Amino acid sequence: MREVNKYLKAVLVIFLFFIIKVESKILSIGDTDAKVTVKVFSSLTCPHCAKFHETIFNKLKEEYIDNNLVRFEHHAFPLDLAALNAEIIVRCHTNNETKFKLLDEIYKKQKSW
């Protein structure tokens, strides 16, 4: 029984470490001190998410994010393996601006891939 408890504790520590590392890598754009934070959970293969990104996000970015009034967070919610793989590709880049440009391209070309 003690061996099982040690094993469970080790798994829990690793799991918590992973969660903490993932949380610190939120894909965001805008002022970190903005009074408003918009959190969007989306799948890169969802047509409704693409529509939001192509229409509303660009206006939101131009009017509010670029003026440091809003911080925008993109949270991955992959609905299938293709969305997960696309999200992994986005996360490989180091700069958030580049990541958001890649998100633009992925959403624009969503129907073709």
Which residues make up each language-model segment?
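Boundary at the C-terminal end of the N-terminal hydrophobic targeting segment
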Residues: 22-26
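Structural alpha/beta surface segment adjacent to cysteine/selenocysteine redox centers
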Residues: 51-113
